[in-house]
């Protein structure tokens, strides 16, 4: 199995994928993150890293069995979300799986608390509590963190002619699984 992680960051998910696949490719737009991923994953022969944008990937069509964009990447990347899904579908083989994840609405209080801690440590701006709600966290410095709910995932998928399977896990995450036709 050949897997691709979009927005691999420092390699936390890559490291877990390595024992389960023949080859895993991680892409990110941050060279600093990719350098950290090299160290964190201890550069295994079955790992490839590339500095690349997830909405315009330089891979051939149908190159991967599994394409992942987890940890709310579909919202965190600040890109055209439908284009991201279109590209993920393009590079995934027929019968392969595209797997996306975001936060469950049930996880709102925990998520907001985490952002408040980050704000208190000046890692992000002060939270604008009047503008924050419905899965969207807004900071007074202009930063905005969103999520994709079931309806959003279904809308993206139907616009591209594919059918998603949405699963909620532990009242914390929503997973959107699409088997590529």
Where are these regions (language model features)?
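Conserved class I S-adenosyl-L-methionine
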Residues: 1-7, 99-126
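A short SAM/SAH-binding and catalytic strip from SAM-dependent methyltransferases
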Residues: 66-80
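Short alpha-helix
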Residues: 141-160
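A short glycine-rich, Lys/Arg-flanked "PGG" loop and its adjoining helix->strand segment in the class I
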Residues: 82-94
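Class I SAM-dependent methyltransferase SAM/SAH-binding core
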Residues: 10-56
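A short acidic, Gly/Pro-enriched loop at the edge of an enzyme's catalytic core
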Residues: 55-67
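Core SAM-dependent methyltransferase catalytic element
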Residues: 162, 166-181
């Amino acid at each position: 199995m050949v897997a691709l992680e979009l927005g691999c960051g420092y390699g936390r998910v890559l490291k877990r994928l390595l024992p389960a696949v023949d080859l895993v490719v991680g892409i990110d737009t941050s060279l600093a993150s990719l350098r950290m991923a090299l160290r964190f994953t201890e550069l295994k022969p079955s790992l490839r890293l590339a500095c690349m944008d997830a909405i315009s990937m330089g891979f051939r069509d149908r190159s991967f069995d599994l394409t992942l964009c987890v940890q709310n990447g579909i919202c965190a990347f600040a890109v055209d979300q439908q284009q991201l899904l279109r590209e993920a579908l393009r590079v995934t083989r027929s019968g392969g799986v595209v797997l996306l994840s975001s936060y469950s609405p049930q996880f709102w209080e925990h998520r907001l608390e985490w952002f408040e801690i980050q704000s208190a440590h000046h890692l992000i701006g002060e939270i604008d509590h009047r503008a924050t709600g419905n899965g969207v966290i807004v900071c007074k410095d202009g930063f905005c963190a969103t999520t994709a709910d079931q309806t959003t995932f279904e809308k993206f998928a139907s616009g591209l002619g594919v059918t998603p399977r949405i699963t909620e896990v532990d009242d914390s995450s929503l997973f959107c699984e699409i088997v590529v036709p």
